[in-house]
Curated annotation (Swiss-Prot):
It comes from Mus musculus (Mouse). This is Indoleamine 2,3-dioxygenase 1. Its EC number is 1.13.11.52. Disruption phenotype: Knockout mice display normal development and function of dendritic cells, on T- or B-cells development. They display increased sensitivity to the induction of inflammatory and autoimmune reactions. They produce litters of normal sizes at normal rates, implying that compensatory or redundant immunosuppressive mechanisms protected allogeneic fetuses during gestation in knockout mice. Knockout mice display cardiac and gastrointestinal liabilities. Binds 1 heme group per subunit. The lineage of its organism: Eukaryota, Metazoa, Chordata, Craniata, Vertebrata. Keywords: Cytoplasm, Dioxygenase, Heme, Immunity, Iron, Metal-binding, Oxidoreductase, Tryptophan catabolism.
Length: 407
């Protein structure tokens, strides 16, 4: 789209609209549906009762009894996202069950076939991803009330009490707090194209302010998520079957593929926010085999296609970093660095969160009730399949190196 042929404001609005980025909630799914048609009530009945079914040892039996339902009655993006979310929950619960060594290597065809059909329609993988459990897994208790933790809930739950509610909703609220930064991105690109230094400086400042607000929301994770419950219970259900010691060959989707497939579990790397800002600011992460850059590139396949395309759009936009350097303007350089420092600050806090919720619990002596793997295994892998501390340190360090010196 040639931004010069239309007003900057209209151009920015169209870019966001074209890439399914909402004015109010950013990359999150606006107004998710909460009910499936009656024909799909068997899925809903299981998905809404996972903790009880797992505790009673009935989960797998109930899943195996489910009828094979056609996805033809699921028309419209939001309805398909809700069904994909429900089947994602059921799949994770079926594979991991109580989180012990009793892991299923085959997903029955009555779930696998409709799940993979929906995945193909949506352009998402057949595993519970960030796009499902964070971006599409919410509702307001009072529809006319505010978008606050106290007025929100998730649609489905895993064992662990309110741990997943806290984890998913705080992650969602971080997305929403950062949405003004995403809304400012087309303005940044337009300002660079028009060589409008004042507009660019203001847009960069807006991004930095939004990141600071997102970090403040991120801090609430500690208010609502217990580290031991997250590590020993919830983390299991978010784990995927790529680089998995318990599913080294992946998961067989019966009736869909003849061989097992590997997919990563939900990861913050699947959020489009920070990848968008990296691309915008020209932050290049360490490349090579099994590198942060390779992992982040792979995580794009877990994003909704429109959001993935937004990253491609940004990669073809005028380079902001080079423009700022070429202007030799102190205020503009400070505004750029303000954005970079905002990203560094969020990433430093993310490191602290990983330390609290993964590293420290992993070093505690396991009790008989613990469901997690031995510490030697968990320390080297997060739910997305990477070593979370090594990955985040590298990403944070690379971000810091992007700061521009002045004069």
């Amino acid at each position: 789209m040639a931004l010069s042929k239309i007003s900057p404001t209209e151009g920015s609005r169209r870019i966001l609209e074209d890439h399914h980025i909402d004015e109010d909630v950013g990359f999150a799914l606006p107004h998710p549906l909460v009910e499936l048609p009656d024909a799909y009530s068997p899925w809903v009945l299981v998905a809404r009762n996972l903790p009880v079914l797992i505790e009673n040892g009935q989960l797998r039996e109930e899943v195996e009894k489910l009828p094979t339902l056609s996805t033809d009655g699921l028309r419209g993006h939001r309805l398909q996202r809700l069904a994909h979310l429900a089947l994602g929950y059921i799949t994770m619960a079926y594979v991991w069950n109580r989180g012990d060594d009793d892991v299923r290597k085959v997903l029955p065809r009555n779930i696998a076939v409709p799940y993979c059909e929906l995945s193909e329609k949506l352009g998402l993988p057949p595993i519970l991803s960030y796009a499902d459990c964070v971006l599409a897994n919410w509702k307001k208790k009072d529809p006319n009330g505010p978008m606050t933790y106290e007025n929100m809930d998730i649609l489905f739950s895993f064992p662990g009490g309110d741990c997943d509610k806290g984890f998913f909703l705080v992650s969602l609220l971080v997305e929403i707090a950062a949405s003004p930064a995403i809304k400012a991105i087309p303005t940044v690109s337009s300002a660079v194209e028009r060589q409008d230094l004042k507009a660019l400086e203001k847009a960069l400042h807006d991004i930095a302010t939004s990141l600071e607000k997102a970090k403040e929301i991120f801090k609430r994770m500690r208010d609502f998520v217990d580290p031991d419950t997250f590590f020993h219970v919830l983390r299991i259900y978010l784990s995927g079957w790529k680089c998995s010691s318990k599913l080294p060959e992946g998961l067989l989707y019966e009736g869909v593929w003849d061989t097992p497939k590997m997919f990563s579990g939900g990861s913050a790397g699947q959020s489009s926010i920070f990848q968008s800002l990296d691309v915008l600011l020209g932050i290049k992460h360490e490349a090579g085999k099994e590198s942060p850059a390779e992992f982040l590139q792979e995580m794009r396949e877990y994003m909704p296609p429109a959001h993935r395309n937004f990253l491609f759009f940004l990669e073809s936009a005028p380079p902001v970093r080079e423009f700022v350097i070429s202007r030799h303007n102190e205020d503009l350089t400070k505004a750029y660095n303000e954005c970079v420092n905002g990203l560094v600050s969020v990433r430093k806090f993310h490191l602290a969160i990983v330390d609290t919720y993964i590293m420290k619990p992993s070093k505690k002596k396991p009790t008989d009730g613990d469901k997690s793997e031995e510490p030697s295994n968990v320390e080297s892998r997060g739910t997305g399949g990477t070593n979370p501390m090594t990955f985040l340190r590298s990403v944070k360090d690379t971000t810091e190196k992007a700061l521009l010196s002045w004069p």
